[in-house]
C-alpha cells in the first residue's frame, strides 16, 4: 500500500477545503485500485460534494443548523460551542474511499473531495492518502 500525508491549512473559521487536486496528484499513473482518504482528527471530516455555486457554503450553513455553536454541548474545552466540532465526524465522516481507474479518480462531473473543518481552534490539518492497488 502506498501512502502519503499532506498538511492542509484550514484557518480559524469553518471551512470546506477542496483537496481533489492533491488526491489526483497522488494517484496519477498508479493504475486501477482504491484511494482511501483519512483525516486523523476528532473534529474534521471529508465530504464528496460539488464545490462552488454555493454548495460548500450551503453545507456549512446546514451544519450550523444541525450543530449550533452554543452552550448545549457537554464537551466544553476550547472555544465556545466547541462540543459541536466533536460531533461533526458523526455526520461528516473522517474518511472516504474512491475508485481509481487507470491512474485517475473516477469522480462524477461535479464531485470534489473536500476537507470539512468547523473547528477554528486547530487551523492546521493532516490528511492521509492511501492507494490500494486492484
Where are these regions (language model features)?
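Active-site histidine-anchored catalytic micro-motif
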Residues: 1-134
Amino acid at each position: 500500500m502506498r501512502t502519503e500525508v499532506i498538511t492542509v491549512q484550514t484557518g480559524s473559521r469553518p471551512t470546506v477545503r477542496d483537496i481533489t487536486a492533491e488526491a489526483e496528484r497522488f494517484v496519477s499513473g498508479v493504475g486501477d485500485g482504491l484511494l482511501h482518504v483519512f483525516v486523523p482528527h476528532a473534529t474534521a471530516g471529508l465530504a464528496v460534494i460539488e464545490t462552488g455555486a454555493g454548495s460548500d457554503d450551503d453545507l456549512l450553513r446546514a451544519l450550523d443548523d444541525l450543530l449550533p455553536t452554543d452552550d448545549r454541548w457537554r464537551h466544553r474545552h476550547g472555544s465556545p460551542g466547541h462540543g459541536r466540532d466533536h460531533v461533526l465526524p458523526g455526520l461528516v465522516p473522517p474518511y472516504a474511499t474512491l475508485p481509481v481507474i487507470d491512474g485517475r479518480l473516477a469522480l462524477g462531473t461535479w464531485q470534489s473531495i473536500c476537507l470539512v473543518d468547523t473547528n477554528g481552534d486547530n487551523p492546521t490539518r493532516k490528511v492521509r492518502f492511501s492507494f490500494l492497488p486492484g
